[in-house]
């Protein structure tokens, strides 16, 4: 047996993690404390990316490092992956072309997972994601939104939110305000599914 041991369980699937620790039917119910960690600041990421490039004899401008942060919405795994992809393509100084090629490579790498996550979604669910991707975060039951995004009836919105939250594709970021859970999935949908 172990004594004086602490465990740290972590993950980015917020809804799943909450269910594991807050639902009495799960084995980790009230297992410990939940901590919601904020994202690393853009300034800290920018400094880190620039320093890591410099250490290896390459250079990336602060502006390009900031773009990496903004494209990935500062999601740690994506920031690191995209920065690495840009670093791989950089001879001496990273360029906008290196960044765009890195983004394409990131989308290519994530595509099989994104196909798997979206292939069984209903047309209404895809339309709901489309609305969110286009900046609709509230007011889904308004007739103009229902019509523009073909979401069905106002009663359908509750079911859509529930189903997509359970799949960890969307998250509530403020009262009655919804966002995509994964910024790269959102980009993939916009660029490669809806061709926007």
Where are these regions (language model features)?
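Small/polar loops that bind or transfer phosphate-bearing groups
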Residues: 8-9, 37, 181
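Short, solvent-exposed loop/turn segments at secondary-structure junctions
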Residues: 13-16, 42, 185
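Amphipathic alpha-helical "lid/sensor" segments that cap RecA-like P-loop NTPase cores
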Residues: 46, 50-113, 123
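C-terminal leucine-rich, beta-strand-based interaction scaffolds used for sensing/assembly
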Residues: 112-196
């Amino acid at each position: 047996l172990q004594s004086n041991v602490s465990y740290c369980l972590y993950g980015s699937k917020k809804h799943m993690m909450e269910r594991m620790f807050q639902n009495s039917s799960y084995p980790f119910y009230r297992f410990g404390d939940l901590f919601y960690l904020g994202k690393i600041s853009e300034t800290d990421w920018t400094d880190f990316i620039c320093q890591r490039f410099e250490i290896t004899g390459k250079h990336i401008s602060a502006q390009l490092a900031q773009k990496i942060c903004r494209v990935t919405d500062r999601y740690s795994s994506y920031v690191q992956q995209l920065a690495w992809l840009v670093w791989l393509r950089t001879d001496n100084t990273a360029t906008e072309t290196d960044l765009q090629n890195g983004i394409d490579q990131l989308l290519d790498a994530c595509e099989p997972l994104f196909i798997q996550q979206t292939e069984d979604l209903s047309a209404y669910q895809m339309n709901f994601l489309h609305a969110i991707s286009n900046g609709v975060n509230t007011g889904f039951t308004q007739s103009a939104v229902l019509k523009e995004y073909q979401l069905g009836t106002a009663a359908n919105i509750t079911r859509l939110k529930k189903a997509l939250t359970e799949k960890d594709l969307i998250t509530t970021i403020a009262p009655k305000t919804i966002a995509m859970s994964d910024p790269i999935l959102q980009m993939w949908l916009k660029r490669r599914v809806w061709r926007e």
